Amino acid sequence: MSSWTPLLRQFQHYLKIERSLSENSILAYQQDMEKLSRYMEKNFPETSPTQVTLQHLRYFVNSLAELEISEYTQARIISGIKAFYRFLMYEDRITEDPSQLLESPKLGRKLPDTLSYPEIEKILESIPLGEPEGHRNRAMLETLYSSGLRVSELIDLKIGNIYADVGFLRVIGKGNKERLVPIGKDALKYINIYIEEFRKHIQPAKGHEQYVFLNRTGKKLSRVMVFLIIKKQVAAIGLEKNVSPHTFRHSFATHLVEGGADLRAVQEMLGHESITTTEIYTHLDRDYLRQVLNEFHPRK
């Protein structure tokens, strides 16, 4: 067995128990660390994880660049490496952190893609309600835009967590953290139509009885299925943008900030732990204000 295997398993356990990270985040860390372990086993087979030096890590990062792996992916992998060696320090497995001086690529701040409100409306109105899944898809996309949910939060939404009388959803976010999120009347209307008139004709699979959005076999929708549904509707209106479920979330936040919403309130609704994550939307807002100035001010 590789000298990396037991430590990577312990790291995975630490991320789950101590850090309370989601399964998706843990999987991402695991896959990135496996890249490093494979590189070390191939090029420095006698070097255990606790013997790795800064120079080893720099060789590995250089190999990523040679494979033309994007700077954003490199930065994510380096972040995972730093987390792993912080864990080894925490466990007293090493006395010095070899990743401490490991440099990440300098990244320009990439602002997320957004949809305008008319584009959102066109996508929603393009959903054919005459098709069996039409009302489900409309309810689903209305919910994404109305509440700014992550796609994982959307597909995990349960009927018992919809509080229609007060206009809130209880969602399970990253790290299994719960939060209450407001939902608009239009989204609630389409959810109600879907549940009362269409979902009742589907026999839920065992263990999937409480999930709101089901496929034809009665199982909750997958992330990939939601992505494909959105791609189909974007193509239907001829919109040449790279739109994903996360685009609806970004658009939700952007439109709130452009409308003057308090950033702390937006942070709470998005489920961001840190306000700095939410602050990216203030940059979007400044771009919007600059656009208004250029369009309407008499002196260009």
Task: Kindly give the residue locations of the regions a language model identified.
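Conserved catalytic core of the tyrosine transesterase superfamily
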Residues: M1-K300
